[in-house]
């Protein structure tokens, strides 16, 4: 989900982390997914960010907006121009749906990798084999349990696994703000929460650039106790959504091994054990 102001804070948190300050231990092994909206907000700053990542041997992968419409033509042309100007510093793109695959094929950025997000639903070996023709890697589906995820692993098709981050419960073209009140597109949208009958708060991120919402789980997914079971099988992925600069830094330091105390209280292990039917 795009929230350029949160992304700016998260970028600052990353720049203060061990992953940035001590790049030698992760040289060539670290991949950073950068939100396209965040980069397009300030093209000159985007160039500096992409160049600095290349200098530190950190892979830059551009994450496209979750929902795109025909009216986004002008936005896409601006984005394509920005990407072309900085193509030397970009390693690839993240595709969250089939429309992204078609768009990237149309743009034809030769030599750039495409990584599928978990929303592409590679639920079994058949779908995995289908996507091999279009992707250079993929993210394991959040809905499958650990055993089911292992069943679709293929050494010839690199997989990543989300080990931290708020799980998106829904990506919707309907806006919570507009439905409950009125449309209020603004430069810095106020945070919204949905509250259930148990008084749990579910953060809502509004993307006013493309007019969609992402509703996140009330607590983050955290598989810090499961990491040893996946060592050597997948690449671990940290997803930052509602975190500010300090929270981002604390989570990064914990998973970097430089912080001993878990920086958050409540968390969920998602479908790691039970899966879905």
Q: What would you call each of these model-derived segments?
A:
Residues 2-277:
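Active-site pocket-lining/capping segments in soluble small-molecule metabolic enzymes
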